[in-house]
Design a protein with these regions (language model features):
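Alpha-helical transmembrane segments in multi-pass membrane proteins
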Residues: 1-30
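Juxtamembrane helix-loop-helix connectors linking adjacent transmembrane helices
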Residues: 2-9, 32-96, 110, 114
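Short linear motifs at secondary-structure transitions and domain/linker junctions
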Residues: 12-14, 26-28, 65-73, 105, ...
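Structural signal for the C-terminal ends of transmembrane alpha-helices
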Residues: 24-34, 155-158
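Transmembrane helix-loop-helix hairpins at the membrane interface
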Residues: 56-68, 83-178
């Protein structure tokens, strides 16, 4: 069976799963509880909802002014086999954000926040670095992502658990992938 773009879309699932696996393995080897290592806990519902609404507004306003999302063209979805659509959404909209947030707002934020840089430095470094890993985007889009990274970092600091930035990032990518 020949499915166009299967390999590329399969990698969108495999790579985040590998990153998540490495984070989990590192926590187990170092015997660190998830709450300590990456801030895994249930966030305060009202605060998480507030951050999600703020982030949704950032997404919509930034897209209104920069039109980074592009046109609402569903041709690619109609023409692709269902497995490709499932892999694309799973990889880009769910697993990718989980992996990136575990690394940036989980491990890196947690480590930098405990240094002389403090929380502000941790938020700035993770936001700028996260924007930089999207180097294939336009400079304006990278700047937009750095701003998004600051919001993700602020949400991590204000609500404590990493779940809030993960949900925010998933929201962004769901909007972007469609």
């Amino acid at each position: 069976m020949n499915i166009p773009h299967l390999g590329a879309n399969l990698m969108k699932v495999v790579m985040p799963l590998l990153a998540i696996g490495v984070v989990v393995l590192a926590m187990r080897v170092r015997r660190l509880p998830a709450a300590t290592a990456i801030g895994w806990a249930k966030p305060p519902p009202a605060a998480a909802a507030g951050w999600l609404l703020l982030y949704a507004a950032y997404i919509l306003v930034s897209n209104y002014f920069m039109f980074w999302r592009g046109p609402w063209d569903f041709t690619i979805w109609r023409e692709a086999p269902l497995i490709i659509d499932i892999l694309r959404v799973l990889g880009v909209a769910v697993l990718g954000p989980i992996a990136e947030e575990l690394i940036f707002r989980g491990i890196l934020y947690g480590r930098f926040a405990q240094t002389k840089l403090g929380v502000g430095g941790a938020i700035a470094i993770t936001a700028i670095t996260w924007g930089a890993i999207h180097y294939t985007y336009t400079p304006g889009e990278i700047l937009l992502l750095v701003g998004a990274g600051f919001l993700l970092g602020l949400a991590r600091w204000q609500t404590r658990p990493i779940v809030t930035p993960i949900l925010m990032h998933i929201l962004w990518n769901i909007y972007a992938v469609w």
